[in-house]
């Protein structure tokens, strides 16, 4: 798991997300508290439960982006789900317990990758030996047994050196690799994923276990395939499963987006009975319960839950009281201003303007955005958000695509030319659309 301090986490988030300091601080503290808890004595550790977070803010202000970036920083099992994908037990659709099953699968895969990475050097050596045995078969006696001899002779060492330098990469060899397991596609009703997984596992076991298959491939591809195969042999599956379940129980993070969509608004009179039921099904997970997965029983007592929603049609108080009580940290994200849009266009790593400059540079077209041009783009996006539907920073993608449409289309014929995107150019491309509310409603 990540050992970054809250200040380091916020600094990292700042390089991708503009503003929203309160939300960044909250998730940074929550992430650091995961590390702090693991430093405690075991008796006290079991008593410390995570403080779950509810992020409230209009669409397009950075809620989902914070989750995406946090997943990369956490170095822990992390899953992001949409609350609207789930239904109450008994209705057609996915049950909320599948969140924990999917998170456990993520943890198994992550732990396996880390374990294989630790033995990578040994696995590469074993893979090299197998390839060298194909290139330089050992001498055999009259009965077909390998003769004892100087197997690591000068010739073998010479070939090993060439192999490591990549001089043999394009040579083709026939190699025995593990045959892919035969997948059995089973169509099951929604909510029956666990039963489907068990049936698939049973059929795979019946199909003959570990079999090998001769394949002709380049040495560079063979080395990669054999390294993976040898790495898998060097890790203990039982230890790996045990470690993965420990990781998911103590470090797992669940991000639930669009939680406002499963609220029953105060003025709602629809017959959609399964909405509040989803909240009731979520409650045991957030409170702490034990979920059965194909890898074993997983406890959710110490998982961190981060939820978010726009809450335009409902209020946080429309959540059932028990769930509200389990989301003690409330963070309100602010709507973006024209100045925020200007910063979004230039400050983050791989900003939108950088992306367009790099894309068109592949066609040898030089694009330059001036200060006043960027200001005009930001003002245009902000104005359209104000007069039509406010979709936050996502409006910048629409505006930029419209602005760069002509040069993107003609770029292949304008090899070596330059384009300066200033306020005048932006006005000529977007002015009429921004001014006409009906046009901007449909086009921007």
Curated annotation (Swiss-Prot):
Keywords: ATP-binding, Chaperone, Cytoplasm, Nucleotide-binding, Stress response. Gene3D superfamilies: 1.10.8.60, DNA helicase RuvA subunit, C-terminal domain, P-loop containing nucleotide triphosphate hydrolases. GO terms for cellular component: HslUV protease complex. ATP binds at residues 18, 60-65, 257, 322, 394. InterPro entries: AAA+_ATPase (IPR003593), ATP-dep_Clp_protease_ClpX (IPR050052), ATPase_AAA_core (IPR003959), Clp_ATPase_C (IPR019489), HslU (IPR004491), P-loop_NTPase (IPR027417). Residues 141-161 are annotated as: Disordered. One of its GO terms (molecular function) is ATP hydrolysis activity. It is found in: Cytoplasm. Coiled coil: none annotated. GO terms for biological process: protein unfolding; proteolysis involved in protein catabolic process. Pfam families: AAA, AAA_2. It comes from the Bacteria. CDD domains: RecA-like_HslU (cd19498). Belongs to the ClpX chaperone family. HslU subfamily. PANTHER family: ATP-DEPENDENT CLP PROTEASE ATP-BINDING SUBUNIT CLPX-LIKE, MITOCHONDRIAL-RELATED (PTHR48102), ATP-DEPENDENT PROTEASE ATPASE SUBUNIT HSLU (PTHR48102:SF3). ATPase subunit of a proteasome-like degradation complex; this subunit has chaperone activity. The binding of ATP and its subsequent hydrolysis by HslU are essential for unfolding of protein substrates subsequently hydrolyzed by HslV. HslU recognizes the N-terminal part of its protein substrates and unfolds these before they are guided to HslV for hydrolysis. NCBIfam families: hslU, PRK05201.1. A double ring-shaped homohexamer of HslV is capped on each side by a ring-shaped HslU homohexamer. The assembly of the HslU/HslV complex is dependent on binding of ATP. This is ATP-dependent protease ATPase subunit HslU. It comes from Aliivibrio fischeri (strain MJ11).
């Amino acid at each position: 798991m990540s050992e970054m301090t809250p200040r380091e986490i916020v600094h990292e988030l700042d390089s991708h997300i503009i503003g929203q300091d309160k939300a960044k601080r909250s998730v940074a503290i929550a992430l650091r508290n995961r590390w702090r808890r693991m430093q405690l004595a075991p008796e006290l550790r079991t008593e410390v439960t995570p403080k779950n977070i509810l992020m409230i803010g209009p669409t397009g202000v950075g809620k989902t982006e914070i989750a995406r970036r946090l997943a990369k920083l956490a170095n822990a099992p992390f899953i992001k789900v949409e609350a609207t994908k789930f239904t109450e037990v008994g209705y057609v659709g996915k049950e909320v317990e599948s969140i924990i099953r999917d998170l456990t699968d993520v943890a198994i895969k992550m732990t396996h990758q880390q374990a294989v990475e630790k033995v990578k050097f040994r696995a590469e050596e074993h893979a090299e030996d197998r390839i060298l045995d194909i290139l330089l078969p050992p001498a055999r006696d009259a009965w077909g047994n390998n003769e004892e001899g100087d197997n690591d002779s000068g010739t073998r060492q010479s070939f090993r050196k060439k192999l490591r330098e990549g001089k043999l990469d394009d040579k083709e060899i026939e190699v025995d690799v593990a045959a892919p397991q035969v997948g059995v596609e089973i169509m099951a009703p929604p909510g029956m994923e666990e039963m489907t997984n068990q049936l698939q596992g049973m059929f795979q076991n019946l199909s003959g276990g570990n079999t090998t298959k001769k394949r002709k491939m380049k040495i560079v591809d063979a080395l990669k395939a054999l390294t993976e195969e040898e790495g898998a042999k060097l890790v203990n599956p039982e230890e790996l499963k045990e470690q993965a379940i420990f990781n998911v129980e103590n470090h797992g993070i669940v991000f639930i987006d669009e939680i406002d969509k499963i609220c029953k608004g105060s003025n709602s009179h629809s017959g959609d009975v399964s909405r509040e039921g989803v909240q009731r099904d979520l409650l045991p997970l957030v409170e702490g319960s034990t979920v059965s997965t194909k890898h074993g029983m997983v406890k959710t007592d110490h998982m961190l839950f981060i939820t978010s929603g726009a809450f335009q049609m409902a209020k946080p108080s429309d959540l059932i009281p028990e769930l509200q009580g389990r989301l003690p940290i409330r963070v309100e994200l602010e709507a973006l201003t024209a100045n925020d849009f200007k910063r979004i266009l230039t400050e983050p790593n791989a900003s939108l303007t950088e992306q367009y400059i790099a894309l068109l540079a592949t066609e040898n077209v030089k694009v330059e955005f001036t200060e006043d041009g960027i200001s005009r783009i930001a003002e245009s996006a902000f104005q359209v958000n104000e007069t039509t539907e406010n979709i936050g920073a996502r409006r910048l993608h629409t505006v930029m695509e419209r602005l760069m449409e002509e040069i993107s289309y003609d770029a292949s014929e304008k090899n070596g030319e330059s384009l300066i995107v200033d306020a005048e150019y932006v006005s000529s491309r977007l002015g009429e659309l921004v001014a006409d509310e009906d046009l901007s409603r449909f086009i921007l």
